[in-house]
């Protein structure tokens, strides 16, 4: 199917579960032309459609590694969180290895959803970096949190 044929089938909003199920039922690679649209739907907070798509992407693994790398590289911590907590845990170790560079970048960039810590955890779990590197970043994050906590305490006075 073409993108033009697939777009009308896409979920209409964040709660259109029937629409999400319909597009997912078409399967991959049929839905490849609207992959970007599906990834964009995953940005919405508290969305059953986003969760359903994230779960489905978990079953696709290596077929969508490049698409997920692009999505993880964006500045949207919501989509990152959904991919790190719903999609990636369904992948095999070999499939997760494809995201090593992207996960390492996320691990060094704190955000509102603590995706950096999630990425560090995945990196450690699948041995994607040297333990020395992980410990160095963990120590750095603790130091920064300590400084932030002191500033927050000053604001509370």
Where are these predicted regions, by residue range?
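Structural detector for internal amphipathic alpha-helices that build alpha-solenoid repeat scaffolds
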Residues: 8, 15-29, 40, 48-60, ...
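Short amphipathic alpha-helical patches
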Residues: 62-65, 76-80, 92-95, 126-130, ...
């Amino acid at each position: 199917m073409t993108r033009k044929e697939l777009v009308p089938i896409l979920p209409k909003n964040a709660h259109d579960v029937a629409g999400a199920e319909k597009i997912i039922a078409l399967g991959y690679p049929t839905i490849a032309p609207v992959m970007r649209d599906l990834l964009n739907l995953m940005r919405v907070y508290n969305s059953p459609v986003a969760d359903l798509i994230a779960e489905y992407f978990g079953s696709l693994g290596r077929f969508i590694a490049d698409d997920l790398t692009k999505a993880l590289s964006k500045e949207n911590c919501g989509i990152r969180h959904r991919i790190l907590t719903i999609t990636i845990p369904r992948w095999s170790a070999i499939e997760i290895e494809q995201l090593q560079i992207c996960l390492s970048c996320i691990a060094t960039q704190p955000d509102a959803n603590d995706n950096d810590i999630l990425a560090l955890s995945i990196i450690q779990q699948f041995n994607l970096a040297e333990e020395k590197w992980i410990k160095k970043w963990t120590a750095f994050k603790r130091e920064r949190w300590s400084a932030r906590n002191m500033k927050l305490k000053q604001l509370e006075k």
